[in-house]
Protein backbone atom coordinates (compact mmCIF):
# COMPACT_ATOMS: atom_id res chain seq x y z
CA UNK A 1 0.00 0.00 0.00
CA UNK A 2 2.86 2.37 0.89
CA UNK A 3 4.44 1.72 -2.52
CA UNK A 4 1.17 2.64 -4.26
CA UNK A 5 0.94 5.93 -2.37
CA UNK A 6 4.54 6.84 -3.27
CA UNK A 7 3.94 5.83 -6.91
CA UNK A 8 0.85 8.05 -7.05
CA UNK A 9 2.77 10.98 -5.56
CA UNK A 10 5.64 10.49 -8.03
CA UNK A 11 3.11 10.31 -10.88
CA UNK A 12 1.84 13.84 -10.17
CA UNK A 13 4.54 15.72 -8.23
CA UNK A 14 7.02 18.08 -9.94
CA UNK A 15 10.84 17.98 -9.84
CA UNK A 16 11.79 15.21 -12.26
CA UNK A 17 15.49 15.26 -11.31
CA UNK A 18 15.02 15.16 -7.55
CA UNK A 19 11.63 14.43 -5.97
CA UNK A 20 10.27 11.82 -8.41
CA UNK A 21 13.46 9.71 -8.50
CA UNK A 22 13.69 9.92 -4.70
CA UNK A 23 10.11 8.68 -4.25
CA UNK A 24 10.78 5.76 -6.60
CA UNK A 25 14.05 4.94 -4.78
CA UNK A 26 12.11 4.73 -1.50
CA UNK A 27 9.75 2.26 -3.25
CA UNK A 28 12.73 0.08 -4.18
CA UNK A 29 13.52 1.14 -7.76
CA UNK A 30 17.30 1.21 -8.30
CA UNK A 31 18.01 4.60 -9.88
CA UNK A 32 21.42 6.00 -10.84
CA UNK A 33 22.61 9.61 -10.71
CA UNK A 34 21.21 12.49 -12.76
CA UNK A 35 18.07 10.61 -13.86
CA UNK A 36 15.04 12.57 -15.07
CA UNK A 37 11.56 11.06 -14.71
CA UNK A 38 8.69 13.05 -16.21
CA UNK A 39 5.26 13.49 -14.69
CA UNK A 40 2.74 10.73 -15.41
CA UNK A 41 5.36 7.96 -15.58
CA UNK A 42 4.05 4.70 -14.09
CA UNK A 43 6.56 2.23 -12.63
CA UNK A 44 5.19 -1.17 -11.59
CA UNK A 45 3.58 -1.13 -8.13
CA UNK A 46 3.94 -4.82 -7.27
CA UNK A 47 7.64 -5.29 -8.00
CA UNK A 48 9.40 -1.89 -8.19
CA UNK A 49 12.59 -3.58 -6.94
CA UNK A 50 12.86 -5.26 -10.36
CA UNK A 51 13.48 -1.93 -12.14
CA UNK A 52 17.02 -0.61 -12.60
CA UNK A 53 17.64 2.79 -14.25
CA UNK A 54 21.22 3.79 -15.12
CA UNK A 55 22.93 7.18 -14.73
CA UNK A 56 22.02 10.14 -16.96
CA UNK A 57 18.85 8.54 -18.35
CA UNK A 58 15.54 10.26 -19.13
CA UNK A 59 12.05 8.75 -19.08
CA UNK A 60 9.41 10.87 -20.78
CA UNK A 61 5.73 11.59 -20.15
CA UNK A 62 3.16 8.79 -19.84
CA UNK A 63 5.67 5.98 -20.12
CA UNK A 64 4.69 2.75 -18.34
CA UNK A 65 7.18 0.21 -17.00
CA UNK A 66 5.81 -3.22 -16.03
CA UNK A 67 7.78 -5.91 -14.20
CA UNK A 68 4.90 -8.36 -14.00
CA UNK A 69 2.08 -9.60 -16.20
CA UNK A 70 -1.17 -11.21 -15.05
CA UNK A 71 -2.62 -13.79 -17.45
CA UNK A 72 -5.76 -14.77 -15.55
CA UNK A 73 -6.73 -17.01 -12.63
CA UNK A 74 -5.63 -20.28 -14.28
CA UNK A 75 -2.08 -19.15 -15.01
CA UNK A 76 0.79 -18.07 -12.81
CA UNK A 77 1.82 -14.40 -12.84
CA UNK A 78 4.96 -13.65 -14.82
CA UNK A 79 7.58 -11.45 -13.14
CA UNK A 80 10.80 -10.16 -14.71
CA UNK A 81 13.38 -7.39 -14.46
CA UNK A 82 13.54 -4.20 -16.49
CA UNK A 83 17.05 -2.79 -16.87
CA UNK A 84 17.44 0.65 -18.43
CA UNK A 85 21.11 1.38 -19.12
CA UNK A 86 23.13 4.58 -18.76
CA UNK A 87 22.50 7.59 -21.03
CA UNK A 88 19.18 6.17 -22.29
CA UNK A 89 16.39 8.40 -23.62
CA UNK A 90 12.83 7.02 -23.57
CA UNK A 91 10.31 9.07 -25.52
CA UNK A 92 6.75 9.81 -24.39
CA UNK A 93 3.95 7.22 -24.30
CA UNK A 94 6.21 4.15 -24.30
CA UNK A 95 5.36 0.77 -22.77
CA UNK A 96 8.22 -1.33 -21.39
CA UNK A 97 7.40 -4.96 -20.61
CA UNK A 98 9.10 -7.41 -18.19
CA UNK A 99 12.37 -9.20 -19.03
CA UNK A 100 13.74 -6.30 -21.06
CA UNK A 101 17.19 -4.70 -21.04
CA UNK A 102 17.65 -1.38 -22.82
CA UNK A 103 21.35 -0.96 -23.62
CA UNK A 104 23.49 2.06 -22.74
CA UNK A 105 22.98 5.05 -25.03
CA UNK A 106 19.79 3.72 -26.65
CA UNK A 107 17.00 6.06 -27.75
CA UNK A 108 13.41 4.74 -27.69
CA UNK A 109 11.00 6.54 -30.05
CA UNK A 110 7.77 7.83 -28.55
CA UNK A 111 4.84 5.42 -28.59
CA UNK A 112 7.01 2.30 -28.78
CA UNK A 113 6.18 -0.99 -27.04
CA UNK A 114 9.49 -2.47 -25.88
CA UNK A 115 9.00 -6.23 -25.58
CA UNK A 116 12.55 -7.44 -26.23
CA UNK A 117 16.10 -6.34 -25.50
CA UNK A 118 17.40 -3.17 -27.14
CA UNK A 119 21.09 -3.15 -28.14
CA UNK A 120 23.33 -0.31 -26.88
CA UNK A 121 23.48 2.92 -28.91
CA UNK A 122 20.42 2.02 -31.01
CA UNK A 123 17.47 4.16 -32.12
CA UNK A 124 14.54 1.80 -31.41
CA UNK A 125 10.92 2.20 -32.43
CA UNK A 126 8.18 1.63 -34.90
CA UNK A 127 8.32 3.22 -38.35
CA UNK A 128 6.48 6.45 -38.85
CA UNK A 129 2.74 6.11 -39.20
CA UNK A 130 1.40 5.84 -42.70
CA UNK A 131 -1.60 4.59 -44.66
CA UNK A 132 -2.60 1.00 -43.88
CA UNK A 133 -5.78 0.60 -45.94
CA UNK A 134 -8.48 2.53 -47.79
CA UNK A 135 -11.64 2.94 -45.68
CA UNK A 136 -14.82 2.41 -47.73
CA UNK A 137 -17.24 1.87 -44.81
CA UNK A 138 -16.91 4.37 -41.94
CA UNK A 139 -16.42 3.11 -38.39
CA UNK A 140 -19.44 4.94 -36.96
CA UNK A 141 -22.53 3.91 -34.96
CA UNK A 142 -24.36 3.35 -38.28
CA UNK A 143 -22.07 0.44 -39.23
CA UNK A 144 -20.81 -2.66 -37.45
CA UNK A 145 -17.15 -3.39 -36.87
CA UNK A 146 -17.48 -6.35 -39.24
CA UNK A 147 -18.79 -4.08 -42.01
CA UNK A 148 -15.88 -1.72 -41.41
CA UNK A 149 -13.31 -4.54 -41.62
CA UNK A 150 -14.90 -6.02 -44.76
CA UNK A 151 -14.83 -2.56 -46.35
CA UNK A 152 -11.08 -2.09 -45.92
CA UNK A 153 -9.18 -2.11 -49.23
CA UNK A 154 -5.42 -2.51 -49.66
CA UNK A 155 -3.34 0.49 -50.63
CA UNK A 156 -0.71 -0.30 -53.20
CA UNK A 157 2.46 1.69 -52.89
CA UNK A 158 5.33 1.92 -55.35
CA UNK A 159 7.45 0.12 -52.79
CA UNK A 160 5.08 -2.88 -52.73
CA UNK A 161 4.23 -2.99 -56.45
CA UNK A 162 5.43 -6.05 -58.38
CA UNK A 163 8.40 -5.48 -60.68
CA UNK A 164 9.72 -2.42 -58.84
Question: What does each model-found stretch correspond to?
Answer:
Residues 1-40:
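Extended, small-residue-rich solenoid/repeat segments and analogous flexible loops
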Residues 69-72:
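Blade-loop segments of beta-propeller domains
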Residues 77-91, 95-96, 127-164:
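C-terminal segments of enzyme domains that contribute to small-molecule binding surfaces
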Residues 21, 42-45, 74:
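Short loop/turn motifs at secondary-structure junctions and domain boundaries
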Residues 24-25, 46, 77, 95:
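Short, small/polar residue-rich loop motifs at catalytic or cofactor-binding pockets
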Residues 33, 38-39, 44, 54-55, ...:
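Left-handed beta-helix
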Amino acid sequence: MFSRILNTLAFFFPLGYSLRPTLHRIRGVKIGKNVWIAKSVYIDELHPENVIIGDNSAINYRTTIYTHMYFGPKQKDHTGKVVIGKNVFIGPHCLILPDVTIGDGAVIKGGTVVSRNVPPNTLWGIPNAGPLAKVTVPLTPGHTQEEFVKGLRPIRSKKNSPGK
